[in-house]
Amino acid sequence: MWFQIVVEKFLAGVGGRYSDADIDAGLAIHDSLYRGHGWFADGQERAYDHYVGWAFQVYPQLLQLMAPEDPRVKARAALDGERLADFLDDAVHLVGADGAPLVQGRSLIYRFAAAAPFWAGQFAGHTRLTPGVTRRAASGILKYFLDRGAHNADGLLTIGFHSEFPGMKQSYSGAGSPYWAAKGMMGLALPADHPVWTAVEEPLPVESGDTQRFIAAPGWQVDGTVSDGVVRIRNHGTDHANAGVRVADSPLYARLGYSTATFPDLAAESVDNAVAFADADGRLTHRTGFEFLGHFRQDGVQVGASRFTAHWIDVDPDGGPDHGSGAAGTATPGPEVLVASVTRGAVELRLVRVRNAARSRARLRIGGWPADTAAGLASEVLPVEWGGVLDDAGTWHREAPHPVGEHLAIPWIGTAGAVADGDYAAVVVLSGSGPLAEACGARFGANGRFAFADGATIDVDSVFAQLNPA
């Protein structure tokens, strides 16, 4: 869509062949994918990722630079600018203190292209971020990758995330694909006396204090912690599918959590940030096609939830294009599940309501964050004295190269036998600041309220009541 718009607009400017109808049609498609507050879906599915920033927000601003006198372009300048400013308000909360972007979605081999929308805001003058915060975000993203081996010994960008990792190649990737990262260098086209270069860098939101935010379009519940600079999202709205569709989970879209400090396990069946069920052969269910139930804040605590029919997938030989969606196949239904993420800072109380479990006789698995064992991250899943008994636990290991390390570990807790209908709960924590004091201090009190280590509390019964599931 945007490739065609930009190329045809260039041809129009140099006397080449182009079609106004093509450009109009492309702009109409672009507008049809708008989902509010600066966010676009990458197609008709619940597909939200970095393309919102480096494509849907950048190209409209480039079009303004290419054809400022075109009546069509002038007519949409204010609208496109407002959308960009709205998006940047959210995007700046998704950058870690080390400059890491949120590790979620396809085409992550484009690396520091994630900085592009921040530069676009300065080019267009449509941003509420100060020049100092803009440069902190953009230069931080660039430095994050350059410090972690993005260039090989020949000085070339390779397919990978930190260093080269060919396993990240997707069906549309080529040897030159990593050079889409060039968008992240857009700021070099701004003059040396532009405020973005002369201003003193200012702290990112996560460097100034703990952050809480809900981003409605993708259904992301954001918690950033100043103690370790990590931004986490709990995901109840994005799966690169639509409600009711039963396909395999896409590792980069359908997990319950993503962060700036972890890279998802790339296996479709995984305990990575999962609420899943294991059959007699150990196969795990998927959640794609879930229904978003809502989000609210109460006394400094965030709550988001979704429900779904857990399902096993026998993947078709040709499970579909490798553009982010989970693989298609034959689905076998399992239990009905409601999952609520009750979060404050690094700590999540994960509530799980299970129904119709008897038809599957499967074991429950509540999985935590995928942490590289050499990265200094603490990832834990801990039991709490509430709800059904969780009498089994372990850590899933992948002793093989990974986009950000060599040894991946994912803790989990669950049931040793077949799960029964009922309510279950566990504390799920990802921390980069050493001992898990926050997790150890989080517990249920005698009054039935769950208390976080800093004293914030929430009544779990009210969580279910406010979500009001049928």
List each model region and its residues:
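Aromatic-lined, polymer-binding surfaces characteristic
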Residues: 1-88, 92-119
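Residue-level marker of positions within ordered structural domains that often coincide
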Residues: 13, 35, 64, 123, ...
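Glycine-centered flexibility motif
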Residues: 15, 38-39, 99, 143, ...
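Carbohydrate-active enzyme catalytic cores, enriched for enzymes
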Residues: 96-243
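Low-complexity, glycine/alanine/valine/leucine- and proline-rich hydrophobic stretches
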Residues: 206, 210-296
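Extended repeat-based interaction scaffolds and adjacent low-complexity, acidic/S/T/P-biased segments
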Residues: 267-470
